[in-house]
């Protein structure tokens, strides 16, 4: 079989104007970036506001493993399959960050015959959204440091500045730095650092805003520092929100591309799935449910992180109601959760599969708590045996959940027809969607509800500083915000080594942070890396461009 790059480079793309026309976007609502990429003007929302809503489908997964689950590939393949069975479908994905592209991943546009194209463009700069996020974020940092230098009228405590700078590359040496060295002319010296751009609160705010004015209001609420008296200092106090919003005036418009089979795809925004909510923009999702019969989107990591945040944060701010969930798993990944080492995953092991199946069952139970019907997509690998497949099917049947073998990586949309048909049936059951908690509950109650109900924790322990800050946030009027828990993605617990379905464990909340602009309180249950480093052999070393313009090494 061809490599992903070879498949993508041989794709027969249609002009993006034709893709847009097929889903009812008018020529004057498109802003073209060449022949195969476009932004969509938000003016379209006024024209289509009275159109009926299509079905909203969330693709999520079991707890991630090194064996791979194939969530993005499934999302794309499912969109293609829905179109094959006569349903008008659109897929929505997050846009890739350059850091992982040149670091370990080498690209993030699906795989096999379920990819979005033009692959090279999407992975490299795309339409400049992440650069706009970077610039808006760093403008705020520059205005704050200038305020310190010019007399510090707001009495900012330079030891309590929480706004760092960002860049869209993996750079470990920038995690902790000292600014302002070289004398008074160079500003006020202080410790700071850089995060990767997609970890920026600007990105999270972009993806939760409903329009540009909403985004500007969110920017004004961003807390950058605290005064000597302990008062929050915001971007609004620094008069930064207007300039930041101006920099984002194009970035807030969704990007339209296509899959290998010419299914329309929105790729817009890409916040972290741990310290933020890990889903593409609300703007793109709301547009998709108006233009399509089926809007298929995904959320980062496993259902304990991505799906929980999609339901409790994204659906709340976007006024969205999910109609069904596709839970992606593979027999290899389930065996990993049953304790099998990576080099043994190709061997039949029903005992380990049974243990690992508990992880899938827990995620299914969690989805049911939100009242949304689910279908399991079992990504096929050549090493899967008929006994193992039968076991997964029987266990899903016992939970009254449909399961389908997904072959979209090898066959494209054709390999997802059974999944698409079962999904359509699931959406017809009717969603009884509900939130897990109410916003008027205390912040600690919200955190503990997620830890107990979704993760399966027995108790939650707070560091003294975390307790103090939660109380401070509630006293400052932020108690009604949803919570966003940052923890390892590899386990249902906060300990990456606890695979399968651990129970009765204690979750340790070490720190809490306020993302007032994005609109949530982050509870950190573990060390979260917000600026990755490059590995021993970065993907960048194998990426090149030939004299004829052919790009090699992006995979």
Curated annotation (Swiss-Prot):
<dbReference type="GO" id="GO:0035999">
    <property type="term" value="P:tetrahydrofolate interconversion"/>
</dbReference>
<keyword id="KW-0436">Ligase</keyword>
<dbReference type="GO" id="GO:0005524">
    <property type="term" value="F:ATP binding"/>
</dbReference>
<dbReference type="Pfam" id="PF01268">
    <property type="entry name" value="FTHFS"/>
</dbReference>
<dbReference type="InterPro" id="IPR027417">
    <property type="entry name" value="P-loop_NTPase"/>
</dbReference>
<keyword id="KW-0067">ATP-binding</keyword>
<comment type="pathway">
    <text>One-carbon metabolism; tetrahydrofolate interconversion.</text>
</comment>
<comment type="similarity">
    <text>Belongs to the formate--tetrahydrofolate ligase family.</text>
</comment>
<keyword id="KW-0547">Nucleotide-binding</keyword>
<keyword id="KW-0554">One-carbon metabolism</keyword>
<protein>
    <recommendedName>
        <fullName>Formate--tetrahydrofolate ligase</fullName>
        <ecNumber>6.3.4.3</ecNumber>
    </recommendedName>
</protein>
<feature type="binding site">
    <location>
        <begin position="65"/>
        <end position="72"/>
    </location>
    <ligand>
        <name>ATP</name>
    </ligand>
</feature>
<dbReference type="GO" id="GO:0004329">
    <property type="term" value="F:formate-tetrahydrofolate ligase activity"/>
</dbReference>
<dbReference type="InterPro" id="IPR000559">
    <property type="entry name" value="Formate_THF_ligase"/>
</dbReference>
<dbReference type="InterPro" id="IPR020628">
    <property type="entry name" value="Formate_THF_ligase_CS"/>
</dbReference>
């Amino acid at each position: 079989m061809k490599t992903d790059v070879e498949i993508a480079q041989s794709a027969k793309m249609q002009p993006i104007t034709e893709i847009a026309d097929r889903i009812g976007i008018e020529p004057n609502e498109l802003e073209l970036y060449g022949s195969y990429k476009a932004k969509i003007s938000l003016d379209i929302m006024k024209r289509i506001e009275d159109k009926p809503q299509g079905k909203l489908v969330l693709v999520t997964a079991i707890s991630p493993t090194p064996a791979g689950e194939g969530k993005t590939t499934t999302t794309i393949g499912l969109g293609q399959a829905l179109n094959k069975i006569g349903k008008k479908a659109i897929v929505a994905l997050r846009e890739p960050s350059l850091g992982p592209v040149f670091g370990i991943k080498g690209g993030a546009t699906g795989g096999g015959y379920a990819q979005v194209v033009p692959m090279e463009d999407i992975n490299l700069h795309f339409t400049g959204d992440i650069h706009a996020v970077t610039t808006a974020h760093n403008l705020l940092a520059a205005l704050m440091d200038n305020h310190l230098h010019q007399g510090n009228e707001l009495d900012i405590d330079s030891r309590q500045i929480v706004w760092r700078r960002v860049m869209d590359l993996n750079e470990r040496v920038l995690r902790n730095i000292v600014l302002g060295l070289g004398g008074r002319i160079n500003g006020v010296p202080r410790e700071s650092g850089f995060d990767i751009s997609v970890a920026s609160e600007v990105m999270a705010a972009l993806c939760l805003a409903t329009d540009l004015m909403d985004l500007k209001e969110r920017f004004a609420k961003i807390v950058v520092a605290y005064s000597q008296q302990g008062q929050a200092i915001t971007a609004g106090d620094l008069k930064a929100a207007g300039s930041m919003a101006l920099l984002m005036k194009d970035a807030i418009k969704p990007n339209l591309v296509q899959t290998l089979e010419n299914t329309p795809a929105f790729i817009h925004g890409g916040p972290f799935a741990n310290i933020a909510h890990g889903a593409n923009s609300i703007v793109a999702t709301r547009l998709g449910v108006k233009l399509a019969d089926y809007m298929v989107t995904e959320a980062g990591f496993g259902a304990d992180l991505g799906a929980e945040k999609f339901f409790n944060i994204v659906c709340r701010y976007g006024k969205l109601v999910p109609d069904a969930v596709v839970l992606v798993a593979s027999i290899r990944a389930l065996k990993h959760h049953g304790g099998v080492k990576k080099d043994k995953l190709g061997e039949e092991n029903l005992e380990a599969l049974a243990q690992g199946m508990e992880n899938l069952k827990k995620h299914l139970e969690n989805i049911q708590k939100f009242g949304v019907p689910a279908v399991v997509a079992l990504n096929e690998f050549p090493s899967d045996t008929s006994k193992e497949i039968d076991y997964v099917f029987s266990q899903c049947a016992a939970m009254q959940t449909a399961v389908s073998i997904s072959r979209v990586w090898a066959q494209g949309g054709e390999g997802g027809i059974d999944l698409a048909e079962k999904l359509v049936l699931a959406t017809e059951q009717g969603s009884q969607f509900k939130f897990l908690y109410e916003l008027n509950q205390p912040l600690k109650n919200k955190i503990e509800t997620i830890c107990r109900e979704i993760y399966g924790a027995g108790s939650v322990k707070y560091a003294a500083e975390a307790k103090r800050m939660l109380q401070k946030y509630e006293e400052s009027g932020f108690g009604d915000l949803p919570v966003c828990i940052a923890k390892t993605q590899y386990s249902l617990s906060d300990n990456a080594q606890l695979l399968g379905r651990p129970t009765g464990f204690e979750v340790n909340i070490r720190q809490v942070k306020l993302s007032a602009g994005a609109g949530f309180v982050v509870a950190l249950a573990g060390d979260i890396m917000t600026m990755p480093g490059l590995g021993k052999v970065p993907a960048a070393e194998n990426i090149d461009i030939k004299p004829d313009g052919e790009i090699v090494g992006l995979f």
